[in-house]
From Swiss-Prot:
<feature type="transmembrane region" description="Helical; Name=2">
    <location>
        <begin position="171"/>
        <end position="191"/>
    </location>
</feature>
<comment type="subunit">
    <text>Forms 200-350 kDa oligomeric complexes independent on heme binding. In addition to form homooligomeric complexes, a portion also associates with the mitochondrial respiratory supercomplexes. Interacts with CcO assembly factors PET117, SHY1, COA3 and COA1, CcO subunit COX13 and cytochrome b-c1 subunit COR1.</text>
</comment>
<feature type="transmembrane region" description="Helical; Name=8">
    <location>
        <begin position="425"/>
        <end position="445"/>
    </location>
</feature>
<keyword id="KW-0812">Transmembrane</keyword>
<protein>
    <recommendedName>
        <fullName>Heme A synthase COX15</fullName>
        <ecNumber>1.17.99.9</ecNumber>
    </recommendedName>
</protein>
<feature type="binding site" description="axial binding residue">
    <location>
        <position position="245"/>
    </location>
    <ligand>
        <name>heme o</name>
    </ligand>
</feature>
<keyword id="KW-0560">Oxidoreductase</keyword>
<dbReference type="InterPro" id="IPR003780">
    <property type="entry name" value="COX15/CtaA_fam"/>
</dbReference>
<comment type="function">
    <text>Catalyzes the second reaction in the biosynthesis of heme A, a prosthetic group of mitochondrial cytochrome c oxidase (CcO). Heme A is synthesized from heme B by two sequential enzymatic reactions catalyzed by heme O synthase (HOS/COX10) and heme A synthase (HAS/COX15). HAS catalyzes the conversion of heme O to heme A by two successive hydroxylations of the methyl group at C8, in a reaction that involves matrix ferredoxin YAH1 and ferredoxin reductase ARH1.</text>
</comment>
<dbReference type="InterPro" id="IPR023754">
    <property type="entry name" value="HemeA_Synthase_type2"/>
</dbReference>
<feature type="transmembrane region" description="Helical; Name=4">
    <location>
        <begin position="244"/>
        <end position="264"/>
    </location>
</feature>
<dbReference type="GO" id="GO:0016653">
    <property type="term" value="F:oxidoreductase activity, acting on NAD(P)H, heme protein as acceptor"/>
</dbReference>
<dbReference type="Pfam" id="PF02628">
    <property type="entry name" value="COX15-CtaA"/>
</dbReference>
<keyword id="KW-0472">Membrane</keyword>
<dbReference type="GO" id="GO:0046872">
    <property type="term" value="F:metal ion binding"/>
</dbReference>
<dbReference type="GO" id="GO:0005739">
    <property type="term" value="C:mitochondrion"/>
</dbReference>
<feature type="topological domain" description="Mitochondrial intermembrane">
    <location>
        <begin position="222"/>
        <end position="243"/>
    </location>
</feature>
Length: 486
């Protein structure tokens, strides 16, 4: 009966699977009643299938109808795919890290970081609860070098302000730990994350724990009189340790955000293989290779510029020269200022260069200005280059680059105003937030130009990716075919 009318057979084969098509044609031969077709389809368990399916060219030896269910038809995809909720959680947690970086900057600007002289990760969660406890805490602070040399004039009420600034900063850090660790364990145990993502989460958890130790290591450098004497410094934290603390926070932020964006992108690809394969072709284009390298370079420049800003904050170098574009009356400070022998600790002066580059406030400010100029011109040059190559650059990546151009312009303006207005707390804090915003835009841009992971790519290209119809339409077409004479 099948070969009696091949034209009708071809129409039916385009809409039914190998099994359902054979059963349906037998039913058509026996009866033209659509209820019989429904019974046969119900036996093959396709009646209840309401998801979209792909139409493939007809072949008597191959299926024309194949549902896509990751957990059954493609177990490899199940192992590679991570839940969207994991991505949203990671991006949300990265937002908390962004907030604590800004709060840490405020703690530094208000000189509150050394107000808590002990590190108690668990018992230090609660602040002093009564007058007696406050007085005991104040006595501990009075024994610190900062109080003896800088803050001997403050009273208990003033101490409470700087104490709460540091306490909130530490409490926020503990909250991030809980918000990250507990859901990470849940997602891993419930198998909502792939092995690839589990490795990332494990690394981020270790980095988060390290950040807590680095924070106390930094604070201790401002409480130890011997270290202050060795640095010939006033009671303040080491600029090296401050920058390390800042850099660790930046790495933690980047790791969370990058992983979250990657998960969202891969979920989108699995949902729409057609669009994914089209994007793969663009990303495989050799013409986009230079832009991919440029995106990584911009990410590195943004990070290094922010770290040089950390050195400026650690040395209070923002107050050295408060003019722009010149530094004082010159375009550049004198060589004697830049390479001051007073910063050497060796008799042979072999540490002259690196000591001044990292410890001389004048030189450190010049380095930060130079990094800022490099960052701005690099983004500007990349933006101009991308406009010429916009035909080969994905639209979302081009949008991210436009945003980056705006952010770097705003950040440069904030930096100039911060210097001219003698580093007011409000401007300096916004400037620090701008550094992280610039890093964010460069990271998003780089992630959008990144090629897909090979395992995920291999899964995507095997998914059904032609035109789609629904099972309801299949039944409708089968009914029409059944009513036609054979």
């Amino acid at each position: 009966m099948l070969f009696r009318n091949i034209e009708v057979g071809r129409q039916a084969a385009k809409l039914l699977t190998r099994t359902s098509s054979r059963l349906a044609w037998q039913s058509i031969g026996a009866s033209r009643n659509i209820s019989t077709i429904r019974q046969q389809i119900r036996k093959t368990q396709l009646y209840n299938f309401k998801k979209t399916v792909s139409i493939r060219p007809f072949s008597l030896s191959s299926p024309v109808f194949k549902p896509h269910v990751a957990s059954e038809s493609n177990p490899i995809e199940s192992r590679l795919k991570t839940s969207k909720n994991v991505a949203y959680w990671l991006i949300g947690t990265s937002g908390l890290v962004f907030g604590i970086v800004v709060l840490g900057g405020l703690t530094r600007l208000t000189e509150s970081g050394l107000s808590i002289t002990e590190w108690k990760p668990v018992t230090g969660t609660l602040p002093p609860m009564n007058q007696k406890e406050w007085e005991e805490e104040f006595i501990k602070y009075k024994e610190s070098p900062e109080f003896k040399l800088l803050n001997s004039h403050i009273d208990l009420d003033e101490f409470k302000f700087i104490f709460f600034m540091e306490w909130i900063h530490r409490l926020w850090g503990r909250a991030i730990g809980a918000v990250f660790i507990l859901p990470a364990v849940y997602f891993a145990v419930s198998k909502k994350t792939s092995g690839h993502v589990n490795k990332r989460l494990f690394g981020l958890a270790g980095l988060l724990g390290l950040q807590g130790f680095v924070g106390w290591w930094m604070v201790k450098s401002g409480l130890d009189q011997e270290q202050l004497d060795a640095r010939k410094s006033k009671p303040t934290v080491s600029q090296y340790r401050l920058t390390t603390h800042l850099g660790t926070a930046f790495f933690l932020y980047m790791g969370m955000l990058w992983t979250g964006l990657e998960i969202l992108r891969e979920c989108k690809w699995i949902k729409n293989p057609v669009q994914a394969i089209s994007l793969f072709k663009k990303l495989d284009n050799p013409a986009i290779g230079p832009m991919r390298k440029i995106s990584l370079a911009l990410l590195a420049v943004s990070f290094l510029t922010a770290m040089s800003g950390g050195m400026v904050a650690g040395l209070d170098a923002g107050w050295v020269y408060n003019t722009w574009p010149k530094m004082g009356e010159r375009w550049f400070p004198s060589s004697r200022e830049l390479m001051d022998e007073n910063f050497c600790r060796r008799e042979d002066k072999k540490d002259l260069w690196w000591r001044n580059l990292l410890e001389n406030p004048v030189t450190v400010q010049l380095v930060h200005r130079t990094c800022a100029y490099v960052a701005f011109t690099s983004v500007l040059a990349a933006h101009m280059y991308a406009i010429k190559k916009k035909a080969v650059i994905p639209r979302n990546a081009m949008t991210s680059l436009h945003v980056m151009m705006g952010v770097v312009t705003l950040q440069a303006t904030l930096g100039i105003l911060t210097i001219l207005y003698l580093v007011p707390i409000s401007l300096a804090s916004i400037h620090q937030a701008g550094a992280l915003a610039l890093l964010t835009s460069s990271l998003v841009f780089a992630s959008q130009l990144r090629k897909p992971r090979a395992p995920m790519r291999n899964v995507i290209i095997t998914l059904p990716h032609s035109s789609k119809v629904t099972s309801g339409k299949i039944l409708s077409e089968a009914s029409k075919l059944a009513s036609k004479p054979l």
